[in-house]
């Protein structure tokens, strides 16, 4: 009878693939050293304030200035909105955790944070590619710019960016909800992300890890290659500019954008384009700071 009861219990656990024995998690945060918490709080509070002010200013300025109602600034305002949302999903909770003893997040709140984080992270990848393509058309095909980048095309490009974000996030979160999380309730991260949550699973994570690698390859490498190709053509066009002043101005504008893009895709690739066993979670936490907080702060200054 005891054996049968044990078997029935195991079967119920296996069939409850979309449930977790954990009702709340403890976020380990960036550092466990108490003396660093206040310094980290002040640092990331400053970064978040700059991010919010910079991106809101960009959106407001573009919205109120009729002469900025062009495809380029339309995409820049869209990118600022994504950056604002991307940072807001992560940073406020992280700031609270710096000044509280127990960094608790409920299971539903954790899954919600994961879902919206993935939407805007994936959307940012593709929006950066769209802005690079827009610059390529403007510089390399200026006579066809108004035809290629019509408002109709701009609208559908933006829709495509969000569709890819929602689709990718729904797939990842849906498969995450199927896992039985029971090893521990401590997430070794400062927010609910894919690999830290997979590490808590008592059931097989093979499909989840395969999906992370496949979808990350598409959502990171495809936009990155699009941006790389766009800037190769842009730089080739810049080199044909006879004016030294015009060439240096164009290079300075592009270099700041390339730097922000390189930091974003480089840190994202380090986090998601390798198996979880390759690098430590502490290394991944440091890497994730760049694409969750640093790049959203830099984008308004580097891309405009």
UniProtKB/Swiss-Prot annotation:
Swiss-Prot/TrEMBL GO biological process terms = G protein-coupled receptor signaling pathway; sensory perception of smell
Residues modified by carbohydrate are: 18
The record's principal subcellular location, in a coarse class, is membrane
- Gene Ontology cellular component? plasma membrane
Compartments reported by the entry: Cell membrane
Which cysteines bridge via disulfide bonds? 110-192
Q: Which UniProt keywords apply?
A: Cell membrane, Disulfide bond, G-protein coupled receptor, Glycoprotein, Membrane, Olfaction, Receptor, Sensory transduction, Transducer, Transmembrane, Transmembrane helix
Where does the chain cross the membrane?
Answer: 42-62, 70-90, 111-130, 155-175, 194-214, 218-238, 258-278
Pfam families in UniProt: 7tm_4
Kindly give the membrane topology term recorded for this protein. Multi-pass membrane protein
Q: Which Gene3D superfamilies match?
A: Rhodopsin 7-helix transmembrane proteins
Matching PROSITE patterns, A to Z?
A: G_PROTEIN_RECEP_F1_1, G_PROTEIN_RECEP_F1_2
Give residue ranges on the Extracellular side: 1-41, 91-110, 176-193, 239-257
Instruction: Please give the residue ranges for the topological domain Cytoplasmic.
Output: 63-69, 131-154, 215-217, 279-304
- Which InterPro entries does the entry link to? GPCR_Rhodpsn (IPR000276), GPCR_Rhodpsn_7TM (IPR017452), Olfact_rcpt (IPR000725)
Q: Which GO terms describe its molecular function?
A: G protein-coupled receptor activity; odorant binding; olfactory receptor activity
Q: What does this protein do?
A: Odorant receptor.
Family statement drawn from the similarity comment of this UniProt entry: Belongs to the G-protein coupled receptor 1 family.
Q: Which PANTHER family match?
A: OLFACTORY RECEPTOR (PTHR48018)
Annotated protein name in UniProt: Olfactory receptor 8G2
Please give the organism.
Homo sapiens
Q: What is the lineage of its organism?
A: Eukaryota, Metazoa, Chordata, Craniata, Vertebrata
Gene encoding it?
OR8G2P
């Amino acid at each position: 009878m005891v054996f049968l009861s044990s078997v029935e219990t195991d079967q119920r656990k296996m069939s409850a693939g979309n449930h977790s024995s954990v009702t709340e998690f403890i976020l380990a945060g960036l550092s466990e050293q108490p003396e660093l918490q206040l310094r980290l709080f002040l640092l990331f509070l400053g970064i978040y304030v700059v991010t919010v002010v910079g991106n809101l200013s960009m959106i407001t300025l573009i919205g109120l200035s009729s002469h900025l109602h062009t495809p380029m600034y339309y995409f820049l305002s869209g990118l600022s909105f994504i950056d604002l949302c991307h940072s807001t999903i992560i940073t406020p909770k992280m700031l609270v955790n710096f000044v509280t003893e127990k960094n608790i997040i409920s299971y539903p709140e954790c899954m919600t944070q994961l879902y919206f984080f993935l939407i805007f992270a994936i959307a940012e990848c593709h929006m950066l590619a769209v802005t690079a393509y827009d610059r390529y058309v403007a510089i390399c095909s200026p006579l066809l710019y108004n035809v290629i980048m019509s408002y109709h095309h701009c609208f559908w490009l933006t829709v495509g960016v969000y569709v890819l974000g929602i689709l990718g996030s729904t797939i990842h979160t849906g498969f995450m909800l199927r896992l039985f999380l029971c090893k521990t309730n401590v997430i070794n991260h400062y927010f609910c992300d894919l690999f830290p949550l997979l590490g808590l699973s008592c059931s097989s994570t093979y499909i989840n890890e395969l999906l992370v690698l496949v979808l990350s390859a598409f959502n990171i490498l495809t936009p990155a290659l699009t941006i790389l190709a766009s800037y190769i053509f842009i730089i080739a066009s810049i080199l044909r500019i006879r004016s030294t002043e015009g060439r240096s101005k164009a290079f300075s504008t592009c270099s700041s954008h390339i730097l922000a893009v390189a930091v974003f895709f480089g840190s994202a690739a380090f986090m998601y384009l390798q198996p979880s066993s390759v690098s430590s979670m502490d290394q991944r936490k440091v890497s994730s700071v760049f694409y969750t907080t640093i790049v959203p702060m830099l984008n308004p200054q580097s891309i405009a």
